[in-house]
């Protein structure tokens, strides 16, 4: 075979293009080409000690897609590869069936990839195929694709003995393929500074089954750590055993047609670069991830599907919560009925004596897991990497999600201790303009359950503690909260991404109305991170949870699963649906738009906000937090209660303050971002600067509630009762906690520093200066200089009033001064030059005012010492030699 022909064949094998030709045709052409060019093998060999028959003698034979031979007593497994299975593309799906509940949870869907078995000399390679770069198989450029991009070898095994004497089948030791760290536990645990290495000697096969189209393999993998650290879920942290499920399957034959994605609606994508034509604007081809749902009777407007999506409720789900899980799943049928599919989703209960494994990719399972202290849920799904067709989904719900009202912990307070927040880490992250850790995640991550658990904790304690909103049944509260969570996670398994703009479509007054929210819900989408809907108005409150689909959810399903009208092309249908983008009820923005740091530009695209007026919403949350704090001594200091609960409830209010800072600050230098396309009905331009008045309102909100002299004033009686838990736990919390008393100054400094770091963020200040050039000169502008002046006046108001400065304010002023000095003389090119000038001007202003104040004899000793220290720092900064870059 000449070299060029070889490249063509490998290119065809690799690419499996589905852009212009069907997946089935590509696979068949690959098999024919390979078969035609294979050398004819002579399998009749003289007997040897390594004969196929001798190797598998007395072993259990497991026929199926891949024939397996298993000797359980010797823990020996052979995998047979037929000659026509070499170089053929299959799917491999990996699931973690059980974990350690510390770093790795059970039921986690892991890798899903196309692979081939390739014979290289006397070895068989297990190769992950690269499907990200493609071209039509007969295009000349397909040769360049093969030359330019690599596949990945996952593992390899020696061929055992002779080929089968009749069909030439080969045997390999399955341990070399499946008893290895494919889940990358070693790499991931290394991130936590707890690196575990696979111990192959003590890893083994648990169960093997094989069928016509799939082979299912369960293994137990032992990982060890020679320098273990405490891991409270393990009896010995030097050793942990995980179980993994491998599913090997044929690429399913299907008449599924990929659907092109559109940025106006949010779906998970299967994408690749197609180099068949160099005349396209972009090589990217992006498909919506969706299930193959077709009408059984397409001539009718309403029809049952040919093959519905079936979800199984695992038998681990507590009986008392199964109805809520079922309700959350079936809510999506409302959206499918609107596009003409009746009963698109079916829910079944996994029996206690089920013989199938929930890790089997043929079953979509809602699973209950235990990971102490982690109230979370995730809803991953798996898509055909060639077409975007979804074929498997699992949802994992942590048991602690519904244990929120029993939690007793000190972790939250520990994280805001002055020992932690007064370090240089937060300051360095500010001036280096580092992304928060959570913003390095991709769009597949979901933390809704964790946040919802905290929201439910706050809401329940507020309702039960203040009694402002009347009585409520705890069981119904938990039921509705679980429905809210499940419908969100099922949405992910249907292909929908987060929509963090959906909560901005209803007015504050509408959200207070029970009648309105019962009809319309509390948000535009279940795919937002929706807080519990609480009102500071004691006379009216809407429903608490989103237990119905929102307007956006119907739209997203219509785009992904709807059917073109008779005579209408797919392209025209999709454009008609997507062009509804300007509808105020269909607002969309997703993970990369909703950053809570200064890189998030749109204040209406945030997590944990609500209403058309987020600032008003957060003003309500501040009121609620203070009412909760005021109720602590009255409602929680009673016989039978414990002081640690008071400490925990107090921390819930702090959490509300922290959220309000991150999202309210987004208005300052903010830009409303829209996804409309040119020509859309009522189309809007992509960017609109937030009005100057709204930016001022945001700064005033933060000044009043976080930075002002009156922002924090707590009763000593309350502070002296905020005790931590003193009984031991598996984590050793009683030993690790750095402050037994409540670190009130550290808490306040955390909130105030967070505010300043956000407002003075380099990216925000660059954007504010740019925004001044994007607004008509006749319009009111909120400028960077105005923000500097406003913050300086708020933080240092005592020097104008000639007042003593309290402890909270002294800490605030130290942080502010440190930031100004750094901007003025150590900017390191991160800050705009105008910001550097303004910082220096602020230092000169403060130098003059503080000089006068130090002469006053009426000031207390703290204030005098504080002012003298500040003046010394300012003098040194203004007289400092500037760095070379100046």
Annotated model-derived regions:
Residues 94-96, 328-329, 362, 409-412, ...:
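Short secondary-structure boundary/capping segments
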Residues 25-317, 335, 339, 350-473, ...:
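Auxiliary tRNA-acceptor-end handling modules of aminoacyl-tRNA synthetases
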Residues 41, 349-369, 480-536:
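The catalytic-center signature of Zn2+-dependent metalloproteases
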Residues 86, 320-344:
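Zn2+-dependent metallopeptidase catalytic core
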Residues 330-341, 371, 491-492, 496, ...:
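Sec-exported extracytoplasmic/periplasmic mature domains
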Residues 323-330, 334, 476, 480, ...:
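Solvent-exposed, polar/charged alpha-helical surfaces in well-ordered, non-transmembrane soluble domains
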Residues 465, 472-477, 502-886:
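Conserved catalytic/binding loops enriched for acidic/polar residues
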Residues 1-25:
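Bacterial Sec-dependent N-terminal signal peptides
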